[in-house]
Structures are given as C-alpha cells and as structure tokens.
Design a protein with these regions (language model features):
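Nucleotide-state-sensitive switch-loop elements of NTP-binding domains
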Residues: 3-127
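A short, aliphatic-rich alpha-helical micro-motif
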Residues: 83, 137-140
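Short, well-ordered alpha-helix to beta-strand connector turns
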Residues: 86, 143-144
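Short glycine-rich or small-residue beta-strand-to-loop segments that form or flank ligand, phosphate
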Residues: 89-90, 146-148
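Well-ordered beta-strand positions
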Residues: 115, 144-145
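Charged helix-capping and loop-helix junction motifs
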Residues: 130-135
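Canonical P-loop GTPase G-domain recognition
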Residues: 137, 147-152
C-alpha cells in the first residue's frame, strides 16, 4: 500500500541517450524537489552526461553505482538502506533491463515505487519502437509520465 511507503522510489527509465541524466540532474537541483533528508541516487547506466557531484552534495544526495543487472538485488538494496538511511531513492535505470523485473523485486521494508518516469529521445523513438518494441512496452507499461525530448 502507498500509505506504508516510508522511502519513496522515483524510477527513471529510458534507452541510452534518452535524457535521463540531464532530466535527473536538473530535477534534483529544483526547490520543488528538495527534501531535508538524504537522497540515494542509484545509477544503473553510464551515459554521455555526468552528474555534478558538488551539486549533488549540496542537495544531500549520495550515489551508488550498479553496473551489472545481476548486482541489483534485494540484498544490495537492503545494504544501501542500512548504510545510507535515505529519505528517498532515485534510480536511473538501465534501458536494456526489464523494468518489470525491478517492479517485481522484493524491496527493503518501507521502500516502494512512488513514480515511474520514462525519458524518450524523439529522434530515435521510431527506431526503438520498430526494433525493440517489447522492451519499450515493458518500460512504459506502468510509467506515470513520459518525457519526450529532442523534438523537432
């Protein structure tokens, strides 16, 4: 139940170069998204853009990197919960991993998905839809908001 969520998870999905990092880097700096407690940012993919670590420190954001899908486990998340004691979690999810797998994962006690956001590069959307439709549909099935960028 949503009422039982102590630590909301904001799950940001999208294929490589879809604008996830830019979107999150901007959002984490905004007053409307500010909180007093700690934000745990879990990066599951390294794109072209990078986070400004000094700015992240100013927003009390700590970063954990998970490079391999098999390393994203309930045990690893539970360890992060103990180490960081976050007030919220933001996940930049790897676009080649099934979102449904994460949605079905056992999460640490009190954690729950609050919002799913999918970033889409409008210049490559048709190519991904034509060649990776099942992966894209899995990505957007439960998304709350789709952000299209690079629109012409």
């Amino acid at each position: 139940m949503m009422d039982d969520i102590r630590v909301p998870i904001y799950l940001v999905t999208g294929f490589l170069e879809s604008g996830k990092t830019t979107f999150l880097d901007f959002t984490l700096q905004q007053e409307y998204f500010a909180i007093d407690g700690k934000t745990l940012l879990i990066l599951c993919e390294e794109g072209e853009e990078e986070y400004d670590m000094d700015k992240l420190k100013l927003t009390n954001t700590v970063v954990e990197v998970i490079e391999d899908e098999e390393d994203l486990t309930p045990q690893r998340l539970a360890a992060m919960d103990i180490i960081h004691q976050p007030e919220r979690v933001v996940i930049e999810y790897n676009g080649m991993w099934l979102v449904s797998k994460f949605e079905q994962m056992e999460l640490p006690e009190g954690w729950g998905i609050e919002q799913e956001i999918t970033c889409v590069d409008a210049t490559t959307y048709q190519v991904y839809m034509a060649n990776m439709k099942s992966l894209f549909m899995d990505m957007i099935r439960n998304t709350d908001m789709v952000v299209f960028n690079r629109c012409k």
